[in-house]
């Protein structure tokens, strides 16, 4: 189940927009202060030490996809963890080629998952390289080009949740902890 909500409040005469998303019970909240046009989720400047559980990795990936899909994201201000996740785009190009992101039927989650599984050797035990490529593909597809904003990021989040299993999150957590970034 997905729910989106936006809470607007006025503490100390400064307007803040706090969009939040809940996917299958996992909630993410973001802050964006006006007139500052910057979108910062809580894991944006996280380090590998701030991810301790599978739930932390799920939460981080949810926030990350929302962050890269937001048109006011300042990617140059990303923390080291997000820069690592952004770097996975090259893994996606190596595994899937350069044209898959535009060819996937993002509005049909099941078909997307099946197409991506065709590139994976063992779906129940994906390698770190395959996981990086999947996240990189989602990153490439979620990044807003120009000023166009759409809801494709929700489909990307759903596909990511459907294709990744518990073992994948553990493999990804281990990779993040051992990566040099």
UniProtKB/Swiss-Prot annotation:
Q: Per its UniProt record, what InterPro entries does this chain match?
A: Poxvirus_B14/B22/C16 (IPR011212), Poxvirus_Bcl-2-like (IPR022819), Poxvirus_sf (IPR043018)
Lineage, top-rank taxon, reads Viruses
Q: Which gene encodes it?
A: OPG005
Q: Pfam families attached here?
A: Poxv_Bcl-2-like
What is the protein named? Protein OPG005
Q: What is the lineage of its organism?
A: Viruses, Varidnaviria, Bamfordvirae, Nucleocytoviricota, Pokkesviricetes
């Amino acid at each position: 189940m997905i729910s989106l909500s936006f809470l607007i409040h006025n503490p100390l005469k400064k307007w803040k927009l706090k969009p939040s998303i809940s996917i299958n019970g996992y909630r993410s909240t973001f802050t964006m202060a006006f007139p500052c046009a910057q979108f910062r989720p809580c894991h944006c400047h996280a380090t590998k030490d701030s991810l301790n559980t599978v739930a932390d990795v799920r939460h981080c990936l949810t926030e990350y996809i929302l962050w890269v899909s937001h048109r006011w994201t300042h990617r140059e201000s990303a923390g080291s963890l997000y820069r690592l996740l952004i770097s996975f785009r090259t893994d996606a190009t190596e595994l899937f080629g350069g044209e898959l992101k535009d060819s996937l039927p993002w509005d049909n989650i099941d078909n997307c998952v099946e197409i991506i599984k065709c590139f994976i050797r063992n779906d129940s035990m994906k390698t770190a390289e395959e996981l990086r490529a999947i996240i990189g593909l989602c990153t490439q597809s979620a990044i807003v080009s120009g000023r166009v904003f759409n809801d494709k990021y929700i489909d990307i989040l759903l596909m990511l949740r459907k294709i990744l299993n518990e073992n994948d999150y553990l493999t990804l957590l281990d990779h993040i902890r051992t990566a040099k970034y």
